Amino acid sequence: IMPDIIAPVIPETITVHLGAPDSAAQNVVVPFVDYIKNVASSEIYPTWPENALRANIYAIISYALNRIYTEWYRSRGYDFDITNTTRYDQAFVPDRDIFENINDIVDEIFDEYVVREGSIQPLFTQFCNGTTSTCAGLSQWGTVSLAEQGLSPLEILKSFYGDDILILTDTPVPSVGESYPGEPLRPGDDSNSVKVIQTELNRI
């Protein structure tokens, strides 16, 4: 029997390890939206064209959600979702200033992420700066020239990750209060509420 596919949700928080995976570094629990704002402010420049910023922020969101959804670190026995070192993940700098335009874009699109067509799993949107380092994924500086050519955020992303990608929007953002379905769960229930709670229990 195939297990039920649990659709991703936007988590309230993300646990960030402030160092390499095996280092004795501190873990910090950060609201997911604030984490995305911090990473975007640490990884890209606020003066870039807006569509370049949006493409990069989509990649940052999708990368973080992929780490959470696949339980990349937790399935390996770690007690965190992601690290803050760019050797392994994406930059997160505690207590840094957030750029106003990045703040506003993240508030608008934090519940949107990249997938392959036919999939609901957040895409592993690897990226690098495209100057001092290159990789198979997105080139951060490369997004600038593409945005200047008039490409949309999705067109920019397709140029790096392939034409078979989509941006899923309006991803659910359940809070602890919202995960109660409004009526008691009973034996034999097979609703999405059961699946949400099963997923939460599996993560404990």
Model regions and ranges:
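Conserved, single-site charged/polar hotspot
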Residues: 1-204
